[in-house]
Amino acid sequence: PNVTFIETGKNLGFTGGNNVGIVHALHKGADYILLLNNDTIVANNFLTPLINFMESDEQIAAVNPKIYFEDVDGQKNIIWAAGGEANLKLAKSNNRGRGRVDSGQFDSICTVSFATGCCLLMRATVIREIGLLTESYFAYFEDTDWSFRAKANGFSIKYYPHTHIWHAVGKSSQRKNGNSQKT
């Protein structure tokens, strides 16, 4: 694989660091940008179905695959996120299905409130239209903010369950909690 390392000289956080990469990819003519946490394990060929799904509808701004916890007591079928839900009245957001055993209950494609930045495939044209991730969110909630901006501009945010990854939650940030987050 061809890898480009970009030295920023300081810790820009999840948001700022990803924005540096996003700008680089946009300058290189990327059609899609994938944000992928470094504490994830991907299934073989997980990306192709996501791209094909995005190709099916130009109004899709971003998509998440099904995301499992890496390992819960030896089980690898415990859901970490099946897209995101947000309640603006309560100023709360959470990952759909979090902590539930996957028995097929989240196997339908659907529109969601937000797509988590853990594994977020974004359409480049939408980034150009609505902007980068908001850097006042050093880490966390930048994905929710970006998703809401995309939706406010007429785009949709989708969950696509027919491909998946595993997330070793908090390993890179030492954050163990994440069931419910204030926005």
What name fits each language-model region?
Residues 12, 40-41, 137:
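Acidic metal-phosphate-binding loop of nucleotide-sugar-dependent transferases
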Residues 140:
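Active-site-adjacent helical/loop segments in soluble small-molecule enzymes
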Residues 29-41:
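Short beta-strand-to-loop acidic/aromatic patch adjacent to the donor-nucleotide binding site
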Residues 8, 35, 62-66, 160, ...:
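Short glycine/serine/threonine-enriched helix-capping/active-site loop
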Residues 148, 152-183:
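Active-site-adjacent helix/loop segment of glycosyltransferases
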Residues 30, 57-60, 155:
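Short, high-confidence coil segments that cap the C-terminus of an alpha-helix
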Residues 8-28:
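Glycine-rich, basic loop-to-helix element that forms the pyrophosphate-binding segment
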Residues 7, 16-19, 46-132, 136, ...:
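Acidic/His-rich active-site region of diverse nucleotide-sugar glycosyltransferases
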